[in-house]
Amino acid sequence: MDKLDWKIVTALEQNGRQSFAELGETVGLSKSPCWSRVRGLEERGIIQGYAACLNPAALGLEVQSYVEVRISLDAHTEFEAAVMDHPAVSECHTTAGDSDYMLKVFARSVDHLDDLLRHELSKLPGVHRLSTVVCLKTIKQQGRLAEWSRTTQEQRR
């Protein structure tokens, strides 16, 4: 990525809804070359898509938690397929350490979370153990990956 690509991804990370004309003005390109650059970043997989950032609490999902999951060795495929289909799970990551996976889960209340844990998540394929941490307050939700990546790349030179 060159300096112009970094400017583009940084600007889009801050506001993915801007027009190509606005983006071009921000980074110093006209509309057509800006569109071509963005298309190239999409084709290379650097830009994976565009989505609205929703406020879970405004949707009635007041409780955010992280659930560590330990599963049996032969259940990874089935577990991952079940997690992909479960609407309460917004993220799933494989982990190193005592657990196999980390899930980000939203619920309407602590009672709803308790129900999800006892009657749904604990029954996913291969689950041996769940350990849950409830978030009290979100301080930072979306970091600026473009700036961080560019900074660390420059430090390696």
Language-model-detected regions and their locations in the chain:
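A compositional/biophysical signature of low hydrophobicity enriched in polar/charged and small residues
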Residues: M1-R157
